[in-house]
Amino acid sequence: TRAAIFQDNKILLVQENDGLWSLPGGWCDVDQSVKDNVIKEVKEEAGLEVEAKRVVAILDKHKNNPAKSAHRVTKVFILCKVIGGEFQPNLETIGSAYFELNDLPQLSLGKNTPEQIALCFEACHAKHWETRFD
């Protein structure tokens, strides 16, 4: 799961230990729903409490990300709303910041691409969004 969190028309990205940036998120644990997992991952990586509001997209990683893996992976992008918290350094991320679409930092392309982030911006601005899926 990957969380799309907006503030002032900017999207939240977290900086990983390797210096690359991504939407907060991670593997979905077998005992958690997609909704519960995205809430947990945002708390772990960004220190924020969120409400999951809308599914933006359900995408096949092999079709949409350059980094390939031996496993078939489905990525679920969720539009979320912040309800509390603040960033705390942790084991997975060293920082967080909000970015405009035309000013994205160097991304972790196996986790999210500029096109996927643009899709999140599009969903954020749409009154009636239809989930994109492969």
Positions of PLM-derived features:
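Short loop/turn segments immediately following the C-termini of beta-strands
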Residues: 16
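A conserved beta-turn-beta hairpin within the catalytic core of GNAT-like acetyltransferases
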Residues: 19-21
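Thr-Gly-centered strand-to-loop micro-motif
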Residues: 23-25
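Aromatic-lined ligand-binding clefts that engage carbohydrates, nucleic acids, or primary amines
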Residues: 125
